[in-house]
């Protein structure tokens, strides 16, 4: 669609061209998310290409927030002396700020895509498809829908196209189209009309190496694009890394990645983005854990989740809110607070039944600023206007009124039920013809019923993802379930799965992998319904005799979990405690479960809880010696020798892991490490049984210098952190 579909476009182009020709200072005022960063880059690169004098400014998320900021403008007007300021992905609500700029005799062009208020800024030109009278009245309803679906970067691209056309250099639009692709995908706008073209063509350009920085960023993230690039790969690799810079620190590395022509500067930007993304992941994990504990301990029955903490970083509270919606399916409002300014800042995420922007608008009389759309929004308020409790009460009242007694329940639209043997590479190839996928064109969701879970592993730096292996008539198939590492599934469970299939290439081998969207398992349903009584004895001392007497006199079946050898040995004097000890292998149904020791990972904890299914849980604080890495190596060496001389080399992974109080991953790593130093040869690997052949004894010092040793110590650190968590975490009693 021609850019002149925007009524103010000719006026905007005339002013921009005048600024370029007269070498006036042009300032692009952007935003700190991926849409804002790519929008900024589109206009900066275009105006530089045309010979313009252009600079950019992106506000600090924490100090300045979204949109034009008066304090920032004072500095910019005095230091950069722009004659023309162009906003991208913001500005439509900045009435007073534009008046302020106008008072200095400077011109402002607003390019934005957010909902427009009744009063719009007195700008030189406004390019926003959602503003009143902004579009040509001759447009059809479908054309209007396409334009109002543009992301901020799509609107900026329209301006760039119009200016390039004026200079007869429209072919340059292909140089900036990759930016439009990234911003459009990241901002979750509907992939209809021109958005679909932007994404389809841009993915092709990026995959073909059109933009060095984006190609290098994909390489850094480990994304193989030999067979092309998908919208999902952009959404889960490029977009989070660009967003991380604006969330955590300065957004400059993200902008430089896109606009720089210096390969060294681009590579440095990628290193910075990767580091910021890791920090962002850690912050999200920690903040969600804190917020979730607070929510659980509150025992709230509210239909909205409203939480605040001055220590939560404003840059990641939106992601945390999204995780709450995924877990609880309730509209969620996560806030941080500044004591210095007496201001609360909130990021909100919604559910499809309730419009989050409408909820916020309903309490706007208590707010200093707000914005948003159907599923996401945000606001600020000072304690002079309202207290946190006032806002919490108002939000819940609004949600209750909108629900009118209805219960919120998540649902998943399924396209087709298949048998597992119908899920193959040809299915994925046929589905790929419908790409690119995104809003208004989701990837198809399929269902396969009655599968058997063969293997389960946790993935990710914080073990937040699940990798499952299910049995098929022709072998097995791998599945991944992002951000659901907490789901208590067990090997052997019968599963009904909803998924999207994709091609996975690993070590040159191509296979089908299922990206799970939901799972039904009978055992899972039973686990969710179990409500146990919890008792916290971790601050108590000298209670072993009392506990021993309790078990002796109780009619209830009691299990005592302990795998640590020192703990087991020290419990021997207490007959009834000692006789009640179980581990991950022999755990059985009991009325009461006592933890004198803690499992090595969440997967083991869930397995024990399902096997024992207790009515009551007792957490004990028992001084355990967490064995050092070298101590375990010596013990493990003895286990290997015993296996090879007495058990014909048949090594049981799970039993060994239980005996040492570690994970199966640790045992497998140890076996590979001992094979590397030629102490053993692994002659056969089954799911849980490795066959070993002893070669000769090896000095411990030789083992300590293997490449696998650092992997082993990292796994042990993770185990120790997990066990320590149970020693210190808050327990809901």
Region locations from a protein language model:
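Acidic, two-metal ion nucleic-acid-processing modules in DNA metabolism proteins
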Residues: 48, 53, 196-291, 349-352, ...
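Hydrophobic helix-and-loop "lid/oligomerization" segment in the mid-to-C-terminal part
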Residues: 1-84, 103-105, 122, 140-141, ...
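Long, low-complexity, charged/polar intrinsically disordered regions in eukaryotic proteins
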Residues: 594-629
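Structural motif
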Residues: 25-27, 83-86, 559, 591-594
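Short, ordered loop/turn segments at secondary-structure junctions
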Residues: 31-32, 59-62, 90-91, 113-116, ...
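Histidine/acidic-residue-rich, glycine-tolerant segments that coordinate divalent metal ions
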Residues: 88-150
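A short helix->loop->beta-strand "cap" motif at the edges of active sites that frequently abuts
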Residues: 82, 104-107, 612-617
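Short alpha-helices
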Residues: 42, 122-169, 173-185, 607, ...
